Amino acid sequence: MQSSAARPTDDFDFAVDLRGIPVDTSNPVMVTGATGYLGSWITKGLLDAGVTVHAAVRDPRNTSKVAHLNRIAEQAPGTLHLFAGDLLRPGSYDQAMEGCSIVIHTASPFIRAVADPQRDLVAPALQGTRNVLAGVERTPSVTRVVLTSSIAAMYGDAVDIRRYPGRIVTETCWNTTSSL
């Protein structure tokens, strides 16, 4: 499914500002789900900060999916390396992790038409995170792991959002109406 979400090269006022956050630019940083919404912005922030990014994507040969990352890399001081990675295949991130000091895990299934939420979303997200963390255990250079999530984990059928001040969802909010 092609996402219509804004990408970092689109005309959109959003940025990942890494100023003040200690990032060792001498070691690569791996980003899973680098073609996704959050992964793309994190990749852009790292490249803008001069970091070498090992971007794990489903298929680095799919030029339509990685074109925006290549455009960002052309204009940033950092260096981009694309790697194939499959959330559900153990060991598929090992090559991308090699030599990295930080792993930022943003990859997760995001499907709008879900037939079986446990099978289609929860199980692959858990297995994918386990696979990434198992890779970290095998990679001595990794000293930090950042796990991310999405508004999709908290925002279900929009009932909960009505009670939040200004209908703004923050880290203090939790989805109490959705279920599997």
Task: Go through each PLM region and give its residues.
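Conserved Rossmann-fold NAD(P)-dependent oxidoreductase catalytic core, especially the SDR/UDP-sugar
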Residues: H105, P109, V114-L180
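NAD(P)H-binding glycine-rich loop region in Rossmannoid oxidoreductase-like domains
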Residues: P60-S64, H68-Q127
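Short, well-ordered alpha-helices that flank and scaffold nucleotide-derived cofactor binding pockets
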Residues: K44, D48, R71, A134, ...
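A structural signal for isolated positions on well-ordered beta-strands in alpha/beta enzyme cores
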Residues: T52-H54, H81, V146
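N-terminal Rossmann NAD(P)H-binding glycine-rich loop of SDR-like oxidoreductase domains
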Residues: P22-A56
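Juxtamembrane interfacial secondary-structure elements that flank transmembrane helices
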Residues: A55-V57, R61-K65, M154-R163
